[in-house]
Amino acid sequence: MWPFPSDK
């Protein structure tokens, strides 16, 4: 999920 780096 952007703009979050933890899109895993």
Swiss-Prot record:
Keywords on this record?
A: Calcium, Carbohydrate metabolism, Glycosidase, Hydrolase, Metal-binding
* Catalytic activities: Endohydrolysis of (1->4)-alpha-D-glucosidic linkages in polysaccharides containing three or more (1->4)-alpha-linked D-glucose units
Stated EC number for the protein is 3.2.1.1
Q: How is the cofactor bound?
A: Binds 3 Ca(2+) ions per subunit.
Domain of life of the organism in this record?
A: Eukaryota
**A GO molecular-function term, please?**
alpha-amylase activity
Query: Is Metal-binding a UniProt keyword of this protein?
Result: yes
Q: What class of enzyme is it?
A: hydrolase
Cofactor(s) in the UniProt record = Ca(2+)
Complex formation: Monomer.
Family, per the entry? Belongs to the glycosyl hydrolase 13 family.
Its name, as the record gives it, is Alpha-amylase 2
Give the species this sequence originates from.
Answer: Capsicum chinense (Scotch bonnet)
